[in-house]
UniProtKB/Swiss-Prot annotation:
Keyword Amino-acid biosynthesis belongs to the record: no
Region described as Disordered: 1-39, 84-140
Protein name: FLYWCH family member 2
Compositionally biased residues, Basic and acidic residues: 98-114
GO molecular function: RNA binding
Residues annotated with Phosphoserine modification: S21
Gene: FLYWCH2
InterPro entries with a match to the protein in the record: FLYWCH_N, FWCH1/FWCH2
Pfam families linked: FLYWCH_N
Biased composition (Low complexity): 118-127
Alphabetically ordered keywords of this record: Phosphoprotein
The keyword Cell inner membrane belongs to this UniProt entry's keyword annotation: no
Length: 140
């Protein structure tokens, strides 16, 4: 009976002395769950036209109230007028400009509306207006 070659015996002895290795990917240690971060100041995004909801957000210390939809000037005015009287003039003046441009382009509009708009320039036409001008340290 032929004897196996010494190299084969060494290979078998090494294989026999080794512990069976686990399959790759079976020794996965699960990571500890992380706690979500808490943010001290969040911006409230609302699409509501209800001024009571805006006032409620104001009481909670929200610095800026924004809308997700396409709000009219009156909706934005309700959110800002209670605290910023200077902003009120800018918001009230802003809707007049698009109406003037539209009335000049569309000759079929009512002339009584044009005469009321063309009486004078808007009060805050030259002012720059930022809808969220509250400093971070102050609440509405």
């Amino acid at each position: 009976m032929p004897l196996p070659e010494p190299s084969e015996q060494e290979g078998e002895s090494v294989k026999a002395s080794q512990e069976p290795s686990p399959k790759p990917g079976t020794e996965v240690i699960p990571a500890a769950p992380r706690k979500p971060r808490k943010f001290s100041k969040l911006v409230l995004l609302t699409a509501s036209k209800d001024s009571t909801k805006v006032a409620g957000a104001k009481r909670k210390g929200v610095h800026c109230v924004m809308s997700l939809g396409v709000p009219g000037p009156a909706t934005l005015a309700k959110a800002l007028l209670q605290t910023h009287p200077e902003a009120q003039r800018a918001i009230e003046a802003a809707p007049q400009e698009p109406e003037q441009k539209r009335s000049r382009q569309d000759p079929g509009t009512d002339r009584t509306e044009d005469s009321g708009l063309a009486a004078g320039p808007p009060e805050a036409a030259g002012e720059n207006f930022a809808p969220c001008s509250v400093a971070p340290g102050k609440s509405l």
